[in-house]
Amino acid sequence: MIKVDKLPDVFIKAMPVLQTLEDAGFEAYFVGGSVRDLLLDRHVHDVDITTSAYPEEVKELFAKSIDTGIRHGTVTVLYGGESYEITTFRTESGYQDYRRPDHVTFVQNLDEDLKRRDFTINALAMDLHGQIVDLFNGVEDLKNHIIRAVGDPEKRFHEDALRMMRAVRFTSQLKFNLEEKTEQAIKDNHELLKKISVERIREEFVKMGIGPHSRQAFQIFLDTQLSEDVPDFAGKKELLQIYPQLQFSPTLETSLWSLIIILLKLPDEDISKFMRDWKNSNAMTEQVERIIKFFDLISDHTPNDYELFQAGERTIINTIDVAHILGQPVASEALVDRYLALPIKKPAELAIDGRFLIKHGMRPGAELGHTLNKIRELVVSSRLENSPDAIEKYLEDLD
């Protein structure tokens, strides 16, 4: 049996929670992703705890708790300034929506609880003394960099179809490979993904897409035909096949969506709908549209100063990132340096505003907006000094 001697602070801080449960006569373990990441020497953000205590028994032991998912056996305990999800050992049955169990049964056996988990590398538990409980050779799979379903993969994916996306996502994040039977079960059951909400799929897709091994994971995503069951990808395998051959993997979500849109050759008028279909936020959609617009511009010609100003620093940098990933030559340093050298970089930095123009006899309306934009363009391109006096003289000369 493996024993971990040196534990990160996140586990040490949670030890009194396990000790409290054990002192009351219950079993308690750290479980799941935190144990996996500990053994992989990855940063552990938070820990999950599983116990033989029923939810009401957990609540009696701790002064502060929240019923976060009490029907399914989960109580959040507030302790030492941290919150800990504590879930009773359980088995599950009946998955009519291919996502959540219809019935949860509390059990007194850790083994039964671990059997219901998705992958061997996530079906690991650790006790108070750092002893690892490994019923399904998860530690061996960690060593061999393998994602393998616990037990029968078909059964696991029928219980929760999102697990198919999670499997591919883990290959990207962890740089692991899919075990043969697990991959075959995804190929045989990929259509079940249609039963899952787009929001859930999107979350896994983004994690897959910006993971360090995303190009290889994307190839699995295509080969297993999961790509046929997500918004707007059906029948587009040939276009998307370029993704695994990209120069680099994207590390930003904006870059990921921009790359997908470019590969799909979506016209500008379809971008907003595509982003909505994937349940992206308006802010994300706006950022991606700006990147695509600037990417098209730099693909066509070298931008002038005002075009750099209109794009803004973040869009310029993000677009350069996309161009590099696609292997498109772009004078990145020159573009950024030129932007940083602009007389003004934001509309608010202009020395005057619309009220200044009104004070000088201009009526509110389209002409005022046009004049303000013209002044801004002249200032940005260093053809007009950014001062009220210089702008006032420019207005007088117009008259």
UniProtKB/Swiss-Prot annotation:
It comes from the Bacteria. Its cofactor is Mg(2+). InterPro entries: Bact_CCA-adding_enz_type3_sf, CCA-adding_enz_C, CCA-adding_enz_firmicutes, NT_sf, PolA_pol_head_dom, PolyA_RNA-bd. Its EC number is 2.7.7.72. The keyword tRNA processing applies. Pfam families: PolyA_pol (PF01743), PolyA_pol_RNAbd (PF12627), tRNA_NucTran2_2 (PF13735). CDD domains: NT_ClassII-CCAase. Keywords: ATP-binding, Magnesium, Metal-binding, Nucleotide-binding, Nucleotidyltransferase, RNA repair, RNA-binding, Transferase, tRNA processing. ATP binds at residues 33, 36, 117, 160, 163, 166, 169. Mg(2+) binds at residues 46, 48. CTP binds at residues 33, 36, 117, 160, 163, 166, 169. Signal peptide: none annotated. One of its GO terms (molecular function) is ATP binding. NCBIfam families: PRK13299.1. Catalyzes the addition and repair of the essential 3'-terminal CCA sequence in tRNAs without using a nucleic acid template. Adds these three nucleotides in the order of C, C, and A to the tRNA nucleotide-73, using CTP and ATP as substrates and producing inorganic pyrophosphate. tRNA 3'-terminal CCA addition is required both for tRNA processing and repair. Also involved in tRNA surveillance by mediating tandem CCA addition to generate a CCACCA at the 3' terminus of unstable tRNAs. While stable tRNAs receive only 3'-terminal CCA, unstable tRNAs are marked with CCACCA and rapidly degraded. Belongs to the tRNA nucleotidyltransferase/poly(A) polymerase family. Bacterial CCA-adding enzyme type 3 subfamily. A single active site specifically recognizes both ATP and CTP and is responsible for their addition. This is CCA-adding enzyme.
